[in-house]
Each structure stands twice: as C-alpha cells, then as structure tokens.
Amino acid sequence: MPLLAGDSHRALDTPNVYYQNHVSCPEFDVVGLSFPGMPAFPHFGHNPWVAWCVTHLGADYQDLYIEQFKKDDSGYYKYKDQWRRAEVYQETIKVKGGDDVPLKVWVTQHGPVISGNPEQGSGIAFKYTATEGPSTWPDGLWQMLLAKNSDELIESMREWVDPCNNLVFVDTDGNFGHLCRGKVPIRSKANGWLPVPGWTGEHEWQGYIPFEDMPKAVNPEEGYIVTCNNRPVGNDYPYYISTDFTPGFRAQRVTKRLLSLERP
C-alpha cells in the first residue's frame, strides 16, 4: 500500500490559514485541512479510498500588456491596425471616516488597466486565468470528495483553474501519482519575462494547455514521487509553464533520503 506524506511548509500564521476538520454525511466522509469559509479540502485530505496533498507548482498564468490609448477620454486603444474601445466604468470607493474616492476603471480585451493613465496615452492591462470566465473549482472540489480511486480524483481536477498545484495522491487500490492541476495559457515564453506590447497581437493566449498534456505521473517505475515546488518537467516538455520554479535542492535531498532507506 503506498504511503503519502506532505506538509504545507507555510509561514507561521496567527490565526493559521488551515482549519483541520472532519466532515461526514451520507454523500461523503472526509478528513483534512480546509480554509475557513471555503468548502471542501483543496490541499490536504482523504476519504475512505483516496488521499491527496499539494505543493505549489509556480506556474505563470498571469500576463501584463502595455496598451496604447488615444490621449483623450474616448477610451480607444490600439490593436494591430485598429482602434478598439475599452469598457469604462465609474466606481466609488467608500472610505470609513473619509470622503468617497471616485475611480475610473478601464478594461481592454486583455483585462483591467491596473497601472498608467489611459487618458495620457498608455496603461498596463492585467490578464488572469481566474478572471477569464466563471470559476469552476467548486464543482471539482465536490467531485474530489466523492472520488473512489485515483482515476476519479484526476478527472475531478479537469476544470480546476487556480491556483496551479502539484497534486500528489494515493488510493486503496495501491495506486499513487502526481498531477499538475490548473489552467495554464498557451502563449509566447516572452510573456513570462516582462510586460508585453498589447497592440501587436503577437502575445495573445492560444487557449490553455490541454488537461491531458499537463504533467502527470501514475505509478512511475521508480516507485516514488517527490515534489517540493521544483520544476516538474524536463526541457523537452512542449509548453511554457514558468520561468520561476523553486530550486531543486529540497527535492534532491528528499530523493536521496528515500533511496537510502532499506525495506524491513
């Protein structure tokens, strides 16, 4: 029977971000760590058949686009050889004990402008997988609670969006595995270094890495899986995931200790 061991290696928080609890009902029976106010057990948990834990994948799924605006309040910004009109919203920020603060929000095809001044000709727009459409992670968490084996657990993560994690799991059938879960956009690796020009069309997202192509290992012949926020794929992996994985020394140390163990 495979053994699963994981730790959150989070900073010491008061109050702790995790809440250990046991939820039992006719539909499921799960023990794990949840976030107060959040349903289910996205990071650490087990039911009678499957157990899981996570580390941070470090995937890059947010981009910044430099936008060129007309120097007026018309809201037009340049894209290729066209001028497109941004959505403009007038918001009011309520300040306790102070005056209201008016805020004009500009949204281009790449997302809301978070820096700069469009009325003076430029701004930086923020594009993020979790705001590209309705969030579907609650559906995945529900299916996670009901999983009877590793295959069902993997399938429950098909619509997981954010955050991207290394999900490690075992089941009572003797299977164990690792899945990189979450939506990672397909686009130029240049998007991962600096804000990119929004007007050229060269840095647009081309969908997401297919779920079947996300890094995954089930019952690897080595007989073990180690993940410590380190790079999960080799240089031959065809998609860009990140340029900012954690150095691999922790994973190397854990692997060395595992290989030094002798079976009783």
Residue spans of the language-model regions?
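Mature extracytoplasmic enzyme cores
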Residues: M1-P264
